[in-house]
Amino acid sequence: MVLMKDEVEVIGFDDAPFNKADKVCILIGTYMRGNRIIDGIYFRKFKKDGMDVTEKIIDIVKEKHYKKIKVIFLAGITFGGFNIADLWEINKETEKPVIVVIDKYPNKEKIFLALKKYFDDADERIKLINSFPEPEKMENIYVQYVGADKEFVKNVIKKTKLKSKIPECLRISHLIGRGFLGLR
């Protein structure tokens, strides 16, 4: 069994909803201790359908709480359309485990068709997605993880959930993102 304190420090990233006409999107990172104490909320702009969300995530993680953060949670591998977070690069640059949490198993065939239809660099994006571990069912969610083992992932998710099936840091980042809808 992996021993972990209840107030394990984690950060969870999600994006705010966006419109088709938007050129930039908003990334939200919520830094928490366990499942109850919020110690920071961070924002970055990134390009819709670009390839810069990875550097924005790394930038936030390396900011104020770098030494305290034990785990990076992502609400999926794509942000702002098809801006793909490179799990390997985030793990390498931050030296932190990266855990992706999603509700449903992704339809890769549909994703790859969309990439091929709209992106000149579709092959590069598809190669990146295929390099990631396959999503794995864990209770009622799917997870992908880099830099950690299954037992660690189960334990940290358990410690960081409250009443939802996902870690609180992701739930709060999502709620904050939804709040941006009123600004449009």
Swiss-Prot record:
Pfam families: DUF99
Name of the protein described by the UniProt record: UPF0215 protein MJ1150
Organism: Methanocaldococcus jannaschii (strain ATCC 43067 / DSM 2661 / JAL-1 / JCM 10045 / NBRC 100440) (Methanococcus jannaschii)
Family (UniProt): Belongs to the UPF0215 family.
Transmembrane stretches, start-end: none
